[in-house]
């Protein structure tokens, strides 16, 4: 590669690096639900040593962190009783604003094929259920892609770009068990409900167990790689 081409590539790449905003995992998006009355962990990446601020509109508080040598940072924000919509703004000098954020009850919908079964084409009277789903806009849905890892991950791959507002279209490929559970919760509690689907048909229960926990069980101590 000649000097002229090298200089051209540097000139193209450096502005991108200098203008890069703080980044968040795909689970933090517009339309998300955060657990009420909790200290909720929010994390992401920024340029090492960069100061990061997280501002929550429900109380106007700002939480500060500094990106580590590897670029990681995290804060814990205090959430109020259920309500919204709110905004969460994350900035290292260039703000990223998450809009239409609700505070409520958040549930993980996990398991095998019985949890994986979707609403569309699988549920009795599913067409009517999909028509009625638009009335439940305070139910929000997050669908996690299937991924394997021997250690907990800081980031996850999600479908549909992140959190979705409940609608007929959006519940179509969401867990039927999870959706009807969330719908009943909403009817009984009357507050925002966040549903996170992370399920995989045919998986063993041990596959959902941490390596540390399996290491405490003699039978699995030497079999962790196969579960």
Residue ranges and their predicted role:
Residues 7-8, 143:
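Sequence-pattern detector for short linear motifs
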Residues 10-12, 118-119:
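Short glycine-/acidic-enriched loop or helix-start segments at secondary-structure transitions
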Residues 21-227:
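Cell-envelope and extracellular/periplasmic
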Residues 1-7:
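Bacterial N-terminal signal peptides that target proteins for export
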Residues 8-9, 18:
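Cleavable N-terminal signal peptides
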